[in-house]
Amino acid sequence: MVDWELMKKIIESPGVSGYEHLGIRDLVVDILKDVADEVKIDKLGNVIAHFKGSAPKVMVAAHMDKIGLMVNHIDKDGYLRVVPIGGVLPETLIAQKIRFFTEKGERYGVVGVLPPHLRREAKDQGGKIDWDSIIVDVGASSREEAEEMGFRIGTIGEFAPNFTRLSEHRFATPYLDDRICLYAMIEAARQLGEHEADIYIVASVQEEIGLRGARVASFAIDPEVGIAMDVTFAKQPNDKGKIVPELGKGPVMDVGPNINPKLRQFADEVAKKYEIPLQVEPSPRPTGTDANVMQINREGVATAVLSIPIRYMHSQVELADARDVDNTIKLAKALLEELKPMDFTP
């Protein structure tokens, strides 16, 4: 069963892309230092935990960064304008709370919306929301007051925490991408038994702005096998039948050119051995995960993507099923324990 308290703590810890040092990095170090043989932080901010073995050398990566916001203007009335860090849709911000990390500590702001009573003209009835529409109210009445509160050009913000249990197994919260897989990776590492593989567990940085952390970590580690753990899309209303994975049916593994066929077959065999449900997702092009850069590191790496399906990705109400999380932990643990030296040449 999942550790709800630890999972929530990992999800809600601060860490927008490039600012992972605000919270999540040290939390990951504190957890892994008690179980790994060695834990270090590289110059980009990746946390790399080494579980010593012989062969093959395997790198497992789950990104710890979040999409977020940066203040780029404070007007004379104390309102903030913001720009996105990573793939933030402006419409997801309307009437929502934002958590900021200022020089004077955490502050909150709200993105206002024009009340229906004041919408008289057709142009006020809706339409496309763009970044010019996003105005953040932090409770200040002037630029000077906002600055006194600690806000500056460059202040970082993220979706406010809002972890909600919806039913016995399902829950919604901002930042399941990718904190839910980060939790699963950490939990698999904590539960790891005997293993032949030489294992590097990597909490990677800056994935949301270009897979940057995994690129440098894979160069330093030079693994033979690379497994990216990241969320994927689950069937949801109005998806027009384009999405294959479903909630509650288990973890997901891609098939496609970014995936080593022998590693994929090995994963299928392990899942069957341990009776772990495993869904398949077609990926006809390089995935948007850390496996993309791991695969083409140095002389090439045998890569796979292990995913947890979620609904409503990159919103404040990302939704997952705890049974999928639990089965992902079981499969990740089993893969690492079962991995032996083999020829991964396709």
Curated annotation (Swiss-Prot):
Zn(2+) 2 binds at D177, E208, H314. Its cofactor is Zn(2+). Binds 2 Zn(2+) ions per subunit. It comes from the Archaea. Optimum temperature is 100 degrees Celsius. GO terms for molecular function: aminopeptidase activity; metal ion binding; metallopeptidase activity. Its EC number is 3.4.11.15. The active site is at E207. CDD domains: M42_Frv (cd05656). Coiled coil: none annotated. Gene3D superfamilies: Peptidase M42, domain 2 (2.40.30.40), Zn peptidases (3.40.630.10). It catalyses: Preferentially, release of N-terminal lysine. Zn(2+) 1 binds at H63, D177, D230. Keywords: Aminopeptidase, Hydrolase, Metal-binding, Metalloprotease, Protease, Zinc. InterPro entries: lys_aminopep_Arch, Peptidase_M42, Peptidase_M42_aminopept, Peptidase_M42_dom2. Optimum pH is 8. Belongs to the peptidase M42 family. Hydrolyzes di-, tri- and tetrapeptides with a lysine as the N-terminal amino acid and with Gly, Lys, Ala, Phe or Glu in the second position. Homotetramer. PANTHER family: AMINOPEPTIDASE, AMINOPEPTIDASE YPDE-RELATED. This is Lysyl aminopeptidase.
